[in-house]
Amino acid sequence: MASLIYRQLLANSYAVDLSDEIQSVGSEKNQRVTVNPGPFAQTGYAPVNWGPGEVNDSTVVQPVLDGPYQPASFDLPVGNWMLLAPTGPGVVVEGTDNSGRWLSVILIEPGVTSETRTYTMFGSSKQVLVSNASDTKWKFVEMMKTAVDGDYAEWGTLLSDTKLYGMMKYGERLFIYEGETPNATTKGYIVTNYASVEVRPYSDFYIISRSQESACTEYINNGLPPIQNTRNVVPVAISSRSIEPRRVQANEDIVVSKTSLWKEMQYNRDIIIRFRFDNSIIKSGGLAYKWAEISFKAANYQYNYMKDGEEVTAHTTCSVNGVNDFSFNGGSLPTDFAISRYEVIKENSYVYVDYWDDSQTFRNMVYVRSLAANLNDVMCSGGDYSFALPAGQWPVMKGGAATLHTAGVTLSTQFTDYVSLNSLRFRFRLAVEEPSFTITRTRVSKLYGLPAANPNGGREYYEVAGRFSLISLVPSNDDYQAPIMNSVTVRQDLERRLNELREEFNNLSQEIAVSQLIDLAMLPLDMFSMFSGIEGTVNAPQSMATNVMRKFKSSKLASSVSMLTDSLSDAASSIARSTSIRSIGSAASAWANISEQTQDAVNEVATISSQVSQISGKLRLKEITTPTEGMNFDDISAAVLKAKIDRSIQVDPNALPDVITEASEKFIRNRAYRVIDGDESFEAGTGGRFFANKVETLEEMPFNIEKFADLVTHSPVISAIIDFKTLKNLNDNYGITREQAFNLLRSNPKVLRGFIDPNNPIIKNRIEQLIMQCRL
């Protein structure tokens, strides 16, 4: 009935030969938009528009107009214009070096005939004869004396319709504006001790740097910009310029909010990212004159650097997306040089760099918001690659360059089925640069981009410096670590009783190798995987930290695992496929006697029927039950297991119900099955949920339950490991081919195992940390 199904499952493999067409999907495309994120740097999140978290910037932006400030006596900084904006007639400003110059500037309104007025200048009253013949412009008059008890004399005037006046100390002179607007110009007076000249303004004023003198002259002649003439601009005390600036730390932790159990921490960090490209160069068979492929592949790089006085170990994975395929064919003869395909990244490409280090920031980076980053640009230039021909001069691919500009940052996950590490994925867009790349002794020349032949150009790595900021939700007690959002195995382990976990991990931590932990995590998520998986761990000093494994080891089942696995496979082959899923009119309970529900199937094979009768009343198993619209789907695995258990006579029947019950309820409670028909995929989960999607576009489609039932009867059934939501996230973030989608849909074991690199120090260290957390 379901031989192909269970031969695949019991062999600890999910690969199913769907058709030759599926195997060749994607091979005819000339241009790929895909990404190979490497063996342990997969993204578990879709692209997200994160909030604008605070990022400190060291760039100094000097405004043209600094102010307005309230009138107050102060030491005017050398090389800065003081732009005064009086509102009425009278003394505008006073300045003196207390030795040879006493300057007082008075303002006279338009249309004043010659008259004597009294002004208070430097604390004493003086009578001054003033006049202003202009009917429209205001008149600034500079009154100067050279001795303390001397008389004031008029030194210069400024006729202004903007009512603005300027003064600056620079180059042993005191500069002011004279003439008539809109053609007023500067004039300097030699001052003996100009640096110590103290200025006392009597109106609001602004400070303008000498480098912006042209703007100051523009304001004197034509007036302030409109925004300075609104009621919303309020002058402040000049003492505010003397406030000691707080030096911001490059790396700082800020408590945003805090409760008894949790707190929000903002981490501002500087960062040094080092990465390198990797490539794959494959030669074609024959006379060694032809190359099949030159392509990019994910590259890992580990390094140490000092961050805020602490040495951190960082790990990066560099991958590319949106590659452009080129080719060169020098002729049809076997000795003609040719490259079937070589990849180049250009403006339409992206470079992804996944970054993780062992600092405190990444230990608690689980619940994150307000993620932002500022990074420098980096130029990547290619080197030379010589195509070693058996005879003749060698063609050389040389040149090519591209600049990487930061295009955003998201969370990514470096994970296995046992642990998941949240890391940062920095996304870079490309801009092509000089020089172009060429292949000498061929027609290929003046092409732009970075080819995959030698993308590092002889360098060990490329380096990018910058800063990032994020707000993370962490436990209030710094000794605790935030629970990690892991995949199925870890999540189910955490659901068990804490005391059992501590006891098991205390016993296992020094005796179980990391590779064995990974093997357990990689077990297929179906009931039969326990039988094939226990064979590799039954001789371990301790069980694998689960009650299920302990029960298997303590029972007689461990001694006959191999035979039982073969028996189950044979039994699955013996049952006719036509009854794999049946329409049950009455809502039959999954706890009902399985021998009654599968009697039709059992009767087809007499030997199986005789074995079923021996334990038909003892084994009651809760398996997949998916009720919908009056129809129940019972997983055929229950009948297969029941039919063949009795073939292993030495197995204690009393141990099996406990083992299978706990396995089905706890160890493998999250499960789904999938059937693929052409470009359509149907999926049924244990929770009574159904999905149907298009493989090509990953779009959801209506679920045809009749077609699903027919397909399950006549098609291979695959245990679904990667759900469609994850597939869609991968496609949105990278763009995956139809062939890659099929490999993930059918749970190809090579693809799944590609997620794990046991030699990766990040994963190894994280597993050890997880074990240490569970110790007493």
From Swiss-Prot:
Disulphide bond pairs: C318-C380
Annotated region described as Hydrophobic, given as residue ranges: 389-409
SUPFAM superfamilies: Concanavalin A-like lectins/glucanases, VP4 membrane interaction domain
Superkingdom of this protein's organism: Viruses
Coiled-coil annotated spans: 484-518
Gene Ontology cellular-component annotations: host cell endoplasmic reticulum-Golgi intermediate compartment; host cell plasma membrane; host cell rough endoplasmic reticulum; host cytoskeleton; membrane; viral outer capsid
Gene Ontology terms describing biological process: permeabilization of host organelle membrane involved in viral entry into host cell; virion attachment to host cell
Region (Spike body and stalk (antigen domain)): 248-479
Gene3D superfamilies: 1.20.5.170, 2.60.120.200
Name by which UniProt lists this protein: Outer capsid protein VP4
Species: Rotavirus A (isolate RVA/Cow/United States/VMRI/1988/G6P[5])
